[in-house]
Amino acid sequence: MKEHQCRGGRASPAAPATWLARISVSRGASAIAWTFMLGATAIPVAAQTDDPKLVRHTQSGAVEGVEGDVETFLGIPFAAPPVGDLRWRPPAPPRAWAGTRDGRRFAPDCIGNERLREGSRAAGTSEDCLYLNIWSPKQVGKGGLPVMIWVYGGGFSGGSGAVPYYDGSALAQKGVVVVTFNYRAGILGFLAHPALSKESPNGVSGNYGLLDMLAAFKWVQNNIREFGGDPNRVTVFGESAGASALGLLLTSPLSESAFNQAILQSPGLARPLATLSESEANGLELGADISALRRADAGELTKIAQSRIPMSRQFTKPRPMGPILDGYVLRTLDVDAFAKGAFRKIPVLVGGNADEGRAFTDRLPVKTVLEYRAYLTEQFGDEADAWERCYPANSDADVPAAVARLFGDSQFNNGIELLSAAFAKWRTPLWRYRFTGIPGAGRRPATHGDEIPYVFANLGPSSVSMFGSLEGGAGASDIKLATEMSAAWVSFAVHGVPDQGTKSHWPRFERRGEIMTFGSQVGSGEGLGVSPSKACQPSK
């Protein structure tokens, strides 16, 4: 990815005060459907419509959507606006509204890195951003369809549930209810601060973005029957930071019963996490007066944070803004939890792309052997020589491939290997994949994020302009691959296995290391795409 059923009647009563109690205390073929809403760019507001045609009732009030082969409901609040005194607090219950809310337009995206919401159909950004969107097959009943909830990536610094390539229409046409949502990121989503920890009944702060995710999952549990979904058949799926968050939540007791299955696309697992005290020290860089910080303009606050808190990625150091070991949401490193079997033993589908790292390293000022060695020293210190032996570059021409492999393995592939080994050890159902894409003139090998338009079966103009894997436009081979890949994802959500009714047999990943490859050919085999780190682990 380029740097990247109920009609009429009375509304149900508002959610009780104990809502989210555990958290609040702290192109072409029919398979590829473009059904974007015309004019879906304005901010949604609560409105009394004269003649609502498609209405569903949530616990907070009625919502009007858009009718069609896929019924669409946009901009539904799953939590109260996290503004004012609710800034840097766990998400509070959504406020009830009178009349029928207009659910035909996207709500604002959360404030964050603007580059990460390129193409978004939302009208700008706002701190008031905790909204979700639903795509459901034309209603034939209530509460019987599997649900797929998408968690977008963005390095925990931004993103949007309203970009076109996350449109859920094509997947919904295959018989599932699709949900996307926004969550707080960056300084607004992950600030830890001593004053915030002091005011928390759990004595912690930070991880508000993760709590937003859990709140969205909880809203789905409480309301999705009204949109045709079954709250007992929920598959969460995400990419990059979204997948990383889901992997971390597998180890959190707060995620119990929040979802039934998970799909992790290029997760960044087995990375260091800051402790609460380390993160609180970062937070103090913004100032000691939390009341003043709550009154500050959110956009300006984000800019100040970016100038005062280093945001560059360090392989061996925790993210300056992202999930932390707070002792409440996250209580142990995922490495330790997976080793001990202290994770939710639910079916998981996980994988990555052939050239994960290049999406990041193409922009690095590392082009010569000397620059490469300096980069290794900066990242790994005394272990730089060991890492260079694992990822050698004997000439300047070797450097781009070496640094891309290093980045892809250390940031993505190694964690996937760790998760896979743990699931095999604890005999927990897991399926592995590797996305290679469709070769073509001007196309690079599939890198980070390139699988997304194929998973969503969205190969329209927005995806072509955004993803290098679609350079030159989507052809027949791309359409075929998107059909097969999206069918596998839906099969997993519907049947609990990714090959029910599909063309290719996809065996479970066990100790032999079976992996499904999605590319010019789709098929499974042993040891495909296994990270070089299995034979070369310089830190061991």
Swiss-Prot record:
- Catalytic site positions: 240 (acyl-ester intermediate), 356 (charge relay system), 448 (charge relay system)
What keywords sit in the KW lines?
Hydrolase
Keyword Hydrolase present in the record's keywords: the answer is: yes
Q: Which reaction does it catalyse?
A: fumonisin B1 + 2 H2O = 2 tricarballylate + (2S,3S,5R,10R,12S,14S,15R,16R)-2-amino-12,16-dimethylicosane-3,5,10,14,15-pentol + 2 H(+)
Q: Which terms does the record give in the GO molecular function aspect?
A: cholinesterase activity
Q: Which InterPro entries match?
A: AB_hydrolase_fold, CarbesteraseB, Carboxylesterase_B_AS, Carboxylesterase_B_CS, Cholinesterase, Type-B_Carboxylest/Lipase
- Highest taxon listed in the record's lineage: Bacteria
Which parts of the sequence are annotated with region: Disordered?
521-540
EC no. given is 3.1.1.87
Question: Which SUPFAM superfamilies does the entry mention?
Answer: alpha/beta-Hydrolases
What is the role of this chain? Involved in degradation of fumonisin B1. Catalyzes the hydrolysis of fumonisin B1 (FB1) to aminopentol (HFB1).
Its family remark reads: Belongs to the type-B carboxylesterase/lipase family.
> What name does the UniProt record give this protein?
Fumonisin B1 esterase
Source organism per UniProt = Sphingopyxis macrogoltabida (Sphingomonas macrogoltabidus)
